[in-house]
């Protein structure tokens, strides 16, 4: 952004400004969520529910890589926006350059660890005897693409902070379209099974990352030189804490999913559904939930540059206006999503293949119980991100850690002891209710501070 374009963040009507930035961000993240949905749909019809169960085992490992990427990208995005608000262009350039370097290094390290410890990792995340071969095959090819994936996901929010949310959206969209085209070809024409689904996903990630590289060569406000790509401790310390909430949100989700998968296998094995049906079904339900959360995060993260600029420029009344407009929109999203989950669960699960009556029975129960507190979940997630945008990583990360680790993990372990397999399903709404109380208190305190 140039100075005049930056000024728009501090003067334009909030409603229009929020839509302008949030819509492309939302579409970008929604497209990212569709990567997994598309894989699940084609694998469900081409391989069967064991194939879907295998991808559900691998999914948390992709989320872990995403967590590292968004810690770098979202942190840099928040910091760059604040720097623009303060007129500190040099620090903004150095933050972006170091984020590029760090994302590449992190991606390579994660891929190496995944490759070396593949078998124990899959066992840790709930692979069963029936789906292990599928999981190993899928994970092998996903691992190859991890460095590209981390880089592409880290660059996307940085592109938004440079005033190009539309390009950020298009780069994600291009990768998703490629994935959608290649998936059926790889699975149904070439008969590559889960390997084909993984290869199509990686191909889409390559396209997204390549577009990110092209953008870095033609940035708007950022002027990157070779010196900016050095890793400087002072710059890293300035922006990585701002992305800590995003990282903890993802890493906490990974921990929760690992615990959930293992509880599903343990208590499912003693139920009429067996171990593999609950593991597969809840994984699919979580992918659908990720669509809702992607919209939630997109609406909130799209506002980060606006909040960051106005907070840096000390226009606190505008920050407060964004706060309550955002929370209202997120609550409405949650209500609409809840109605869909309650009214059309069978139609939703049918998208992922034709399975037995027992499978469908558990799917309907899971949609209706596990996601029954969606309006609270969307507001909670928005609260985490808003505090991050204000440059308050402690409150942001604290709420996220409280929800995903201190609540979700103990609940998913303890509730099944009293309610069996259903206890696993009760754990999510219970965690959302308690977190909503904490989020409300934090937001009210932020509102009071913004009034001063």
Protein language model regions, located:
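Short runs within selected transmembrane alpha-helices of multi-pass transporters and secretion channels
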Residues: 73, 142-160, 168-179, 197-210, ...
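Small-residue hotspots at the loop-to-helix junctions and early N-terminal turns
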Residues: 47-60, 135, 139, 198, ...
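Short alpha-helical transmembrane segments in multi-pass integral membrane proteins
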Residues: 1-22, 80-147, 189-244, 307-373, ...
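Helix-terminus/linker motif at the lipid-water interface of multi-pass membrane proteins
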Residues: 34-52, 122-129, 185-192, 254-284, ...
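Transmembrane helical elements of multi-pass membrane transporters/channels
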Residues: 20-39, 141, 152, 175, ...
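N-terminal transmembrane alpha-helices
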Residues: 9-46, 60-75, 79, 104-111, ...
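Small-residue-rich hydrophobic transmembrane alpha-helices
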Residues: 52-112, 149-168, 279-345, 378-399
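Hydrophobic transmembrane alpha-helices of multi-pass small-molecule transporters
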Residues: 64, 179-183, 209-213, 291, ...
């Amino acid at each position: 952004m140039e100075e005049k374009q930056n000024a728009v963040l501090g003067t334009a009507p909030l409603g229009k400004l929020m839509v302008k930035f949030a819509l492309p961000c939302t579409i970008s993240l929604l497209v990212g969520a569709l990567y997994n949905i598309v894989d699940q749909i084609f694998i469900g019809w081409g391989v069967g529910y064991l194939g879907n169960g295998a991808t559900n085992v691998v999914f948390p490992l992709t989320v872990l890589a995403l967590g590292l990427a968004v810690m770098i990208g979202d942190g840099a995005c928040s910091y760059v926006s604040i720097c623009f608000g303060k007129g500190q262009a040099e620090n903004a350039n150095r933050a972006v350059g170091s984020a590029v370097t760090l994302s590449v290094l992190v991606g390579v390290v994660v891929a190496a660890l995944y490759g070396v410890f593949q078998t124990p990792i899959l066992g840790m995340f709930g692979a069963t005897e029936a789906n292990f071969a599928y999981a190993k095959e899928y994970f092998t090819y996903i691992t190859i693409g991890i460095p590209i994936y981390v880089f592409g996901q880290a660059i996307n929010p940085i592109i938004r902070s440079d005033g190009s949310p539309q390009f950020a959206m298009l780069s994600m969209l291009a990768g998703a379209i490629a994935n959608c085209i290649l998936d059926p070809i790889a699975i149904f024409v070439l008969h590559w099974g889960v390997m084909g689904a993984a290869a199509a996903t990686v191909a889409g990630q390559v396209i997204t990352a390549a577009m990110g590289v092209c953008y870095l060569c033609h940035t708007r406000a950022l002027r990157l030189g070779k010196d900016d790509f050095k890793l400087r401790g002072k710059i890293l310390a300035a922006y990585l804490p701002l992305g800590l909430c995003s990282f903890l949100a993802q890493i906490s989700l990974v921990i929760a999913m690992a615990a959930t998968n293992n509880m599903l296998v343990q208590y499912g094995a003693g139920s009429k559904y067996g171990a593999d049906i609950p593991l597969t079904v809840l994984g699919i339900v979580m992918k659908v939930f990720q669509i809702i959360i992607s919209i939630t995060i997109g609406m909130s993260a799209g506002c980060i540059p606006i909040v960051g600029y106005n907070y840096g420029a000390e226009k606190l009344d505008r920050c407060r206006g964004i706060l309550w407009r955002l929370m209202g929109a997120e609550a409405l999203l949650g209500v609409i999503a809840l109605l869909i989950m309650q009214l059309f669960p069978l139609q939703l699960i049918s998208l992922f293949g034709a399975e037995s009556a027992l499978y469908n029975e558990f799917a309907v129960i899971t949609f209706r119980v596990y996601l029954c507190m969606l309006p609270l979940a969307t507001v909670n997630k928005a609260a985490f991100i808003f505090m991050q945008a204000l440059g308050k990583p402690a409150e942001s990360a604290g709420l996220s850690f409280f929800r995903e680790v201190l609540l979700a993990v103990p609940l998913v372990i303890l509730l099944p002891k009293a309610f069996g397999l259903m206890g696993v399903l009760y754990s999510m709404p219970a965690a959302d209710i308690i977190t909503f109380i904490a989020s409300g208190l934090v937001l009210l305190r932020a509102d009071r501070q913004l009034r001063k």
